[in-house]
């Protein structure tokens, strides 16, 4: 088991200095050893439109292929906020044209987004691996995740989906019975329930493929939220937090590391203020302390740190790496990002 280390806060100019690199390399252990990892892709890895996604996944595929070449065994999960919102809007518009058409519920839209996003990632990564002479199966698994029907999240929706809307568009959403949240100076965004995940229904299928050293894309968008009703599974009108399911997936697969890719290069202390400073590493206790201090914003960095804490409490030999797509290659070598250890 790794020894806990005090958190390291560095200035931007120190991010690639030799001392910073040496410290992180020692904490990470032998980078050439085989590692089972869950990689969680954020919005930046996928874009917001079909065209943006097509271009973005090519860049994402190169970064993921780099990890495969470094002998990482990958299980990939991804965001779907913009995609599920786009699909839901399209299905709603279809209802306006065809009055007898039944609008697609959120769970169905989530299922569609898993296939849509998984298809692009799967094919782009497969092509990138083959271009490097690597023949490795890449598969997307439609994944359901059980939730508690009495989860308090159903009574207080907080999960943001889709792009910013004008006040007029927000009022239309409210009339439909949907929840919206205002962001001063930016506009409005739709919010839905984000219940906690209980069990990943298809975990055995995911585990079987992962143990066969195949690249697996699963739990897209947090998974399709379902409620158990005797032997049946009923879709829930909700979206599961992708970071929460990424942490659970890493626990269920007993992974060596959880890699969370986001819009920023690392975790920052006092983010957005004049005192802002990057955190190179922190241990589990320090992560909890930062959470209690309110250092991380809800809906952005907070769920990532909470997922890291949950994973490390259950897999004490593991580690969590938080960085951006741009710096992932340097981060896995200990030159960038934020490393969280037990």
Regions found by a protein language model. Give the residues of each.
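Polybasic, lysine-rich low-complexity intrinsically disordered segments
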Residues: 3-4, 26
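Accessible peptide chain termini
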Residues: 1-3, 32
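Intrinsically disordered, low-complexity repeat tracts enriched in Pro/Ser/Thr
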Residues: 5-6, 14
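Short, Lys/Arg-enriched N-terminal segments with co-localized hydrophobic residues
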Residues: 13-31
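Short hydrophobic transmembrane-like helices used for membrane targeting/insertion
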Residues: 1, 8-10
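C-terminal catalytic "cap/lid" subdomain
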Residues: 33-342
